[in-house]
């Protein structure tokens, strides 16, 4: 999508807040996935650039909720077919909670005292968490040892407002129209 196209309908000539299709991503909108939204009033806004593909059967033209292959669906709560867990009439099955840090049951991550078993989301090593990682990775150049704000390698920046390179939107001299 070019910077001149509306984020809601994909057409050029107007900005999202002036979109004639109405709606928006704000309050009252539910994500449909793959670039579309459904409003509380039932209006659907779908990106025309991506077709609806059913993740259940892999065919285009419908979504999983409308798929004919739903007979294989089983409830995660009771294990029987014909419904899903949110519609299950059986009492909610208690599942043992596991810690996201160490993976052990019986406590949550915030109560974990297995600090030496904590896994860093940045480097993948155990013994520390991301905020304490010494092997930080720069998002600008991809190298380890520094973060983007301290990166010495210059990269071309583009303005989201006018599309020109060399400055950011907050530094743009062209007045925003949207």
Curated annotation (Swiss-Prot):
Residues 25-38 are annotated as: RNA-binding Arg/Gly-rich region (RGG-box). Signal peptide: none annotated. The modification N-acetylserine is found at residue 2. One of its GO terms (biological process) is positive regulation of cell population proliferation. This is CCHC-type zinc finger nucleic acid binding protein. Associates with the 40S ribosomal subunit, the 80S ribosome and with polysomes. Disulfide bonds: none annotated. Arginine methylation by PRMT1 in the Arg/Gly-rich region impedes RNA binding. The gene is Cnbp. The lineage of its organism: Eukaryota, Metazoa, Chordata, Craniata, Vertebrata. It is found in: Nucleus; Cytoplasm; Endoplasmic reticulum. It comes from Mus musculus. Keywords: Acetylation, Cytoplasm, DNA-binding, Endoplasmic reticulum, Metal-binding, Methylation, Nucleus, Phosphoprotein, Repeat, Repressor, Transcription, Transcription regulation, Zinc, Zinc-finger. Its main location: nucleus. PROSITE patterns: ZF_CCHC. The modification N6-acetyllysine is found at residue 8. One of its GO terms (cellular component) is cytosol.
